Amino acid sequence: MSKISDFIGKSAVENVNEALRRAREIEEYNALLSLTEERALERAEKVDAGEISGRLAGVPFVVKDNFLAFGAPTTAASKMLENFNAPLQATAVEKLEAEGAICVGKANLDAFAHGGSTENSAFGPTKNAADKTRVAGGSSGGSAVVTALDVVPFALGTDTGGSIRQPASFNGVVGIKPTYGAVSRYGVVAMASSTDTIGCFATNAEDTDLVMEIMAGRDDKDMTTLPDFWNNQPEFAKKKIGLVKQCMTDDVDAEVRQKTLDYAEKLKRLGYEIEEVDLSMMQHSLAMYYIIVPAELSSNLARYDGVRYGHRAAEVKTLAELYGRSRNEGFMTENKRRIMIGSFVLSSGFFDAYYMQAQKARTLLIDEFKKLFTEYDALLMPVAPTPAFKIGENASDPIKMYLADIMTVPASLAGLPAVSAPAGNSDEGLPIGVQLIGDYKSDKNLLKLVSEVEEI
C-alpha cells in the first residue's frame, strides 16, 4: 500500500522533477502557493551523490504554508506575511529533511489557518480533488489536495479543530491529528496554543505512520512536546469500539451515516465489538471551542502590528494609525471576526462568564472521554456532517461554516489523537471519511487499525 516506498532507491532528481511537473499540471486547483524548485533540486542532487541519506532519501513532500521552511516565503495565505522569508525552519521540517526528504512546495490554506474550507485564503480558494466546484476543506486544504492528486506521497498540515481531518475526508486521503504535544510546534505560525497539533496527509496508514514516527518526539524549543512515545504504545486489548450516537442522527447526511456504519461492519470483521456510546458533552464542544480558540488566537495574532514584521501600512501619521491600518489591510475578514470574538471573551466584564466557564466545560468533556476509554479501544464517528460543499455555499454564513467542525473539535479540546480514514464515495462521487478517536498516546494503534481495514 505504501506510496513512499515507490520513491525510495530511485533518482531523487527524477522524483523531484516529477513532483514539480505534477504540481504545474494541477495549477487550476490552486492547491500550492509556491514551489521550492531551486532548493529542492539542490538537495536532490546531494541525495543522488550520497551526501544526504535516510529513511526518506529523495522522497518529495509539501508543507502547509504556515510552516517555516526555506526556499519560498511563508505567507500563512495572508497579505500580512505575503513577503516573509523565514530565518529558520520548523522542527517537523528539519526532522524530515534529516531523513533525506525533500520539500518541493508550500500549500494553500485558510489565512492563518482560520477556516474550514480553504476559501479564506488571500490567494484564492483551493478546489476539491474530486470536484472542482466544491471546497477542499480546511484549513489544510491545499495539503490534502496535492496528496489526493499524487503530486507527492505525503504532505504536512496543522490541526487545531479539524484542519487535517476534514480536508482528508473531503479529498479521500488519510489524515491524522496526533496527541497534543506529540510533534513540536516550533517554527509553525501559532493559532491556538492549547489545541494546535502537527500532522500529515498520505494515501494510506502505513505512510502516515512512518512520517509521524519521524516527526514525533521531545523538542527543547517547544516545552509542550512529549518524550517520544510513538513506538511504545500498548496494543488495543479491549476489542471494543464505541459508535458515538450523537453523530448518527438525522442532522447528519444519510450517506455519511451509512458509510460510517459500513466502516463499523469492517471493524467487526476484524474482531471488534461495536457498541453505541453517549458523548453527551459533545453538544457543548463547539461553543467551548469558539470561545477558547478565538481567545488564544487573538493573543497570538497581537504580534502582527506592522512594526516588528509583516505587512506595514504606508503613509501613516500616528502609531495608532500604523497598528490599525496594518492589521486591517493584512488580515482577512475571518481573521478579524475571530480576533474580535477572542478579545470580547477575554475582556474584564466577560472573562469569567465565558472563557472560564468554557474551560470548566472542557474539563468535563475530557473526563467523559477518559471514562469511555476505560471500556473502549477507540471511538468511531463521521468526520463532518456532509461531504464537501459547493465553493461559496457557506461563505457568507460563518455559523454554518463553524457547524461543519462539530465532530472534529471534541478530540481537539481533549488533546486526543484522531484519524480520518477514507470510507468510500457518495452517489455523486464525493469522498467521505470516518473518524477514529483514541485515548491519549494511542496514535500508532489507530493507524494500525486503519491499515487493517485498508486490507479488507
Tell me what each language-model feature is.
Residues 58, 152, 274, 296, ...:
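Glycine-rich, small-residue loops and helix-cap segments
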Residues 15-19, 288-289, 335-343:
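Short alpha-helical scaffolding segments that buttress acidic/His motifs in well-ordered protein cores
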Residues 1-160, 262-270:
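Gly/Ser-rich catalytic/binding loops embedded in alpha/beta enzyme cores
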Residues 19, 40, 89, 208, ...:
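Residue-level signal for inorganic ion chemistry
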Residues 3-10, 62, 80-84, 196-203, ...:
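Short, well-ordered beta-strand elements within core beta-sheets of diverse protein domains
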Residues 89-90, 94-215, 412-423, 430-433:
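Short glycine/serine-rich loop segments
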Residues 13-16, 45-48, 252-278, 310-311, ...:
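Acyltransferase
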Residues 177-258, 263, 321, 325:
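A short helix-breaking turn/cap at a secondary-structure junction
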